[in-house]
Amino acid sequence: MPEAGFQATNAFTECKFTCTSGKCLYLGSLVCNQQNDCGDNSDEENCLLVTEHPPPGIFNSELEFAQILIIVVVVTVMVVVVVCLLNHYKVSTRSFINRPNQSQRQEDGLQPEGSLWPSDSSVQRPGASEIMCAPRGRDRFTTPSFIQRDPFSRFQPTYPYVQHEIDLPPTISLSDGEEPPPYQGPCTLQLRDPEQQMELNRESVRAPPNRTVFDSDLIDISMYNGGPCPPSSHSGISAATCSSNGRMEGPPPTYSEVMGHYPGTSFFHHQHSNTHRGSRPQFQPNNSEGTIVPIKGKDRKPGDLV
């Protein structure tokens, strides 16, 4: 044991390098370490380039700087990614919440500027041709079909739908006196005054006459019976609307009754010449039977009753 302790002491006391100034360096690591350990720089003069090593403190500082730079870059990238994701989800949520309100505003905006439902304030000017559109109560509050299919869809322009509705030609129906009343749709083309239109509609639903008396026969009846009767404006009128006193006292005669009194002759025989007026069939009221019986003009005398 004393020998081992002596050898260790001798190793520490042995001079590894002797400086020019006579100073002794006991550690070999102090030689050529780029530090002036001798004081006269004699320990760094004869060092080879291969054996020269930078001090370990330089490597440690560079390593720490690289680690710090890498950590800063990674943290910055992570923060940027998190901010982008939060912004994206915030915009998506806001747009999803605002879509129902936007659809409601667009539906409300169709009333004044979409022309899908006209307003109720349609002014009627007599004598002028105009189109009156009166929306029904059910259609005024009905959402269009293209909005009902996808309420959360983006708003599409209504120009194609409006143009399709405007380009449709108007339908003008002329009354012939026997047709049903016109269809009262949402849009009606009015070419007459309201009073004339109501009169035509009232006449169009009138019951058909029992039999037809043409205008020429009606004029002849009024001339010979002394009762004024205006000419008909239609193709025919009821026989009970005109008589000698302007009122019929009984139902009109049937075809068999008329042909039974005058077999071989036609009940409706038209002659428009004044030379054959005497041979034209005439009508006289029969108070006993309540019917009109025609007689020949040449056999008629004033005051004769059948």
Swiss-Prot record:
Lineage start: Eukaryota, Metazoa, Chordata, Craniata, Vertebrata
Motif PPxY motif 1 mapped to chain: 180-183
GO terms under biological process: negative regulation of cell migration; negative regulation of epithelial to mesenchymal transition; negative regulation of SMAD protein signal transduction; negative regulation of transforming growth factor beta receptor signaling pathway
Lumenal side stretches: 1-64
Gene (UniProt): Ldlrad4
GO molecular function: R-SMAD binding
Domain of life: Eukaryota
Sequence motif: SMAD interaction motif (SIM), positions: 208-211
Species the sequence originates in: Mus musculus (Mouse)
Assembly notes: Interacts with PMEPA1. Interacts (via the SMAD interaction motif) with SMAD2 and SMAD3.
Ranges spanned by the short sequence motif PPxY motif 2, renumbered to the chain: 252-255
Protein name in UniProt: Low-density lipoprotein receptor class A domain-containing protein 4
Topology of the protein relative to the lipid bilayer: Single-pass membrane protein
Biased composition (Basic and acidic residues): 296-306
Cysteine pairs bridged by disulfides in the record: 19-38, 32-47
